[in-house]
């Protein structure tokens, strides 16, 4: 629905947002048109999975299969065809400033198969559009000291996306001074609009019966792997070599009701991550970000 999408993106613009990431699939032409009209930059993301898959019936089933579409080129895999057509379709939209070839890809470990895959996907994009950065959202940098075979994958990219990896940023920045690093997915604070709980505490994955399936709108609830909105933004603000962040998420969505995710008894069906709820009404962190990003 064009009007609903316009309202949603306009609300992000009013909060002070200057860019959005399409997680974890290509955007509709209407979304990109609205973003261009509003002056929002877009990182357009092609895949949430490569050949390893994440669910039994996800795109991983087709990633390396030969493309059978009548417009597919000889020798193209489905991942080649889908990525190429996304870039061809949207390369003339002025809102698009980065292409993403994946999000939290478990098999992107720098071994021969994954290294060949990242090179193949980058080439597919560059053959169509050499003017924009190619990136991906990587969560492996958050484990241990952040090092590993995934660094080889990052070397093939124009911009290196860190998912929840702020704690290892300084070590990796010193190790890779030439990398363009940004937060491809950050925060994952959890909130219920109008519900308030223990403001003096920072609550990590708090899901006891006393919570009544609600998270605190004080901005003090978060997942184990994330940060509060305040801490996430403060890190971004205070590290000049960190090129901004994409917050998880702008609006609530159906599914992933963390911290009650995968608990079959839960009556909750939507996420708590959104800065705006499913009715389109802002939660309190909306005004935190607005106070930092908008001049009034």
Spans of features found by a protein language model:
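Extended substrate-binding grooves/exosites of carbohydrate-active enzymes
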Residues: 1-296
């Amino acid at each position: 629905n064009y009007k609903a999408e316009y309202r949603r993106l306009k609300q992000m613009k009013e909060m002070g947002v200057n860019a959005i990431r399409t997680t974890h699939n290509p955007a509709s032409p209407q979304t990109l048109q609205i973003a261009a009209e509003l002056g929002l930059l877009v990182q357009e993301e092609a895949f949430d999975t490569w050949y390893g898959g994440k669910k039994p019936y996800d795109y991983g089933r087709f990633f390396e299969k030969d493309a059978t579409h009548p417009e597919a080129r000889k020798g193209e895999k489905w991942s080649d065809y889908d990525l190429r057509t996304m870039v061809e379709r949207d390369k003339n939209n002025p809102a698009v400033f980065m292409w993403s070839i994946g999000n939290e890809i478990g098999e992107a470990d720098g071994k021969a198969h994954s290294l060949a895959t990242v090179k193949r996907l980058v080439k597919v994009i560059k053959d169509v559009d050499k003017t924009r950065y190619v990136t991906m959202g990587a969560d492996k940098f958050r484990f241990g000291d952040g090092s590993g075979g995934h660094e080889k994958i990052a070397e093939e990219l124009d911009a290196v996306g860190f998912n929840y990896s702020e704690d290892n940023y300084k070590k990796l920045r010193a190790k890779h001074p030439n990398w363009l690093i940004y937060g491809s997915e950050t925060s994952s604070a959890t909130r219920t609009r109008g519900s308030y709980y223990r403001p003096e505490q920072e609550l990590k994955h708090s899901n006891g019966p006393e919570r009544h399936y609600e998270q605190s709108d004080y901005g003090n609830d978060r997942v184990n792997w994330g940060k509060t909105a305040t801490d996430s933004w403060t890190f971004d603000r205070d590290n000049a070599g960190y090129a901004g962040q994409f917050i998880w998420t702008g609006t609530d969505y159906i599914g992933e009701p963390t911290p009650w995710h995968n608990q079959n008894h839960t009556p909750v069906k939507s996420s708590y991550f959104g800065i705006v709820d499913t009715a389109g009404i802002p939660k309190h962190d909306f005004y935190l970000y607005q106070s930092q990003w908008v001049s009034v």
